[in-house]
Amino acid sequence: KANRCAHYLLERGVHPGDKVGILMMNCLEWLPIYFGILKTGALAVPLNFRYASDEIDYCLNLADISVLFFGPEFIGRLEAISDKIIAHRLLIYVGEGHEPTFSENYVMSAMNYSSENLNIEISDDDYGAIYFSSGTTGFPKAILHKHGALMHSCACEQNHHGQKKDDVFLCIPPLYHTGAKMHWFGSLISGGKAVLLRGTKPETILKAVSEEKCTIVWLLVPWAQDILVALEKGDVNIKDYHLDQWRLMHIGAQPVPKKLIEDWKKYFPHHDYDTNYGLSESIGPG
């Protein structure tokens, strides 16, 4: 799928060094598109799905984005600025149904392209991605990363959490963020499976871990707290799920109360636990 995306982008005039934006919710197409962009030598530019129309317009111009992949959730926000953003820019719709008039349909366009690998040479010193950080004030700040940094994040994460081929990573946070993607990179480099989950309710998370046989789960503090509250109230029962294979729970992106981890260990004493800290500027978690 990534190769088809890359061939499609080359056919549509994308060249090494171009910037290609991704404005999509977590979905099966997200990662093939991301790697398809990288395979062309262009820079992938993930955008925060919470951005309002003016922030989207700002980021498109700041990063000099010439192509934008977007999902159905963003049609309204893009329509509001379509007159400003369609000039000299290709917009590609990724989703079901008919595409908006200002875009072309990705699935219909890319499905017949070759799945063969491209012969485009890319080095660690080539730029590979631009990520946006919220900063402390004003509009988002752009951060430029090389392919070597992306590769380093794979090795760093795998060394940190010890992913192996038989591990299954449950990815809940948004893929536009360096945290979610770089945690997933540990699975990528080890050949392990990843499961994308839309939903943060305790029963939804536990069901996914059980049915998909997940071994590693990255949670945020509110999600972990909700699971503990649901267990304490009896709203969910551990015995209803197959969780023996779940070996690691880690949390990041915010301070983690000591009591939360102590309470977690009461219900999941066999879990390894890790508190993550990372920055978009340093290409994700450490």
Question: Which positions does each model-derived feature cover?
Answer:
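Conserved structural elements of the adenylate-forming
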Residues: K1-R4, D124, A129, I143-K164, ...
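Structural core segment of the AMP-binding/adenylate-forming
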Residues: E11-R12, K39-S109
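Short hydrophobic alpha-helices that are characteristic scaffold elements of the AMP-binding
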Residues: F35-T40, L62, H177, L188-I189
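Conserved pre-ATP/AMP-binding loop-to-beta segment of ANL
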Residues: Y93, H98, N112-F132, F139, ...
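Conserved AMP-binding/adenylation subdomain of ANL enzymes
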Residues: M151-V168, Y176-I216, A230-L231
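Gly/Ser/Thr-rich phosphate-binding loop
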Residues: I189, C214-L219, V229-G286
